[in-house]
């Protein structure tokens, strides 16, 4: 009898252990199923957000293509954008910015030959942004040239406004000597974030510089969309006061003819632009635009950044965040 009770007790214990194990397994399975379902929903919504953002990019391209007048300015439909526009279960924000109102840093070197005009402009941009509080504008300019050009010798001299400024650029030797060495690019800058790899371009400097530079290789600057700092980079005679005059003028109406500058600018500034040939390097239209599309669908989020060439409607840059 005693043995029989012991056997029944042991059987009951085994059953309880099995039930406990099954309960644990079922609980874990239920939790895992919920997690998988949640992950599936998030993946689904993120995918939907991606395609919603992609639709925003395509809509931006269409808006840019519809703009066919003889000038591009900040009062046109493409510059207005949309914020949190509801679409089905989600919402989208689209922002379009002109890139020809910025300095094209890849134009600083043309087929491995540094461009004196663009080097001068970039150096003056550094001065306009008061970068000298955080770094040496001439050294930064030289480091950027060395990052782009294919030569192995550091750029030796910045020539600007009649001054010869000795500099020590940065080629392979510098980057290989770092604690965590890497290769110098010796080629075109592909993303603006890449500038963080270049000697001297600290986060503080980049915060000030990035809004005023672009990846394109065009020399001409759209004066209808250029910032005060970019306008000041165009010629030594364009100081902050002259730049403000130009910006105030275009707020009333976009500049539609370069000849209008003679009416707008002080005589010395206009003559300097015309005499030095800088007037020919200005434009009233833009070829390159950046489209930023942010989409949200429930818990799914996607951000796309694209740059488009207006001439052929082709993307020159595309990034998914």
Predicted segments, located by residue:
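Compositionally biased linear targeting/interaction segments
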Residues: 2-321
């Amino acid at each position: 009898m005693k043995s029989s009770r012991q056997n029944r007790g042991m059987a009951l214990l085994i059953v309880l252990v099995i039930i406990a194990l099954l309960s644990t397994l079922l609980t874990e399975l239920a939790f895992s199923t919920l997690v998988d379902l949640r992950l599936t929903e998030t993946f689904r919504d993120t995918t939907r957000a991606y395609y919603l953002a992609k639709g925003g990019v395509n809509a931006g391209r269409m808006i840019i293509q519809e703009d066919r007048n003889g000038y591009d300015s900040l009062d046109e439909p493409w510059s207005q954008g949309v914020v949190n526009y509801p679409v089905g279960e989600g919402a989208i924000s689209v922002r379009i910015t002109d890139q020809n109102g910025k300095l094209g840093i890849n134009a600083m070197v043309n087929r491995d030959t540094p461009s004196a005009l663009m080097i001068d402009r970039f150096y003056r941009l550094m001065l306009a942004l008061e970068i000298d509080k955080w770094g040496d504008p001439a050294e930064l300019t030289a480091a950027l040239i060395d990052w782009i050009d294919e030569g192995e010798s550091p750029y030796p001299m910045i020539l600007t406004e009649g001054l010869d400024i000795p500099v020590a650029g940065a080629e392979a030797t510098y980057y290989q000597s770092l604690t965590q060495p890497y290769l110098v690019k010796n080629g075109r800058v592909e993303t603006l974030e890449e500038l963080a790899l270049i000697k001297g371009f600290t986060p503080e400097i980049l915060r000030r510089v990035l809004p005023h530079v672009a990846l394109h290789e065009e020399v001409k600057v759209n004066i209808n969309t250029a910032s005060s700092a970019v306008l000041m980079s165009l010629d030594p005679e364009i100081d902050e006061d002259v730049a403000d005059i130009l910006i105030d003028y275009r707020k009333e109406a976009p500049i539609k003819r370069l000849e209008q500058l003679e009416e707008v600018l002080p005589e010395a500034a206009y003559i300097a632009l015309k005499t030095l040939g800088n007037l020919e390097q200005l434009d009233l239209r833009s070829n390159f635009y950046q489209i930023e599309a942010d989409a949200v669908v429930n818990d799914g989020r996607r951000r796309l950044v694209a740059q488009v060439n207006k001439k052929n409607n082709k993307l020159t840059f595309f990034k998914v965040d």
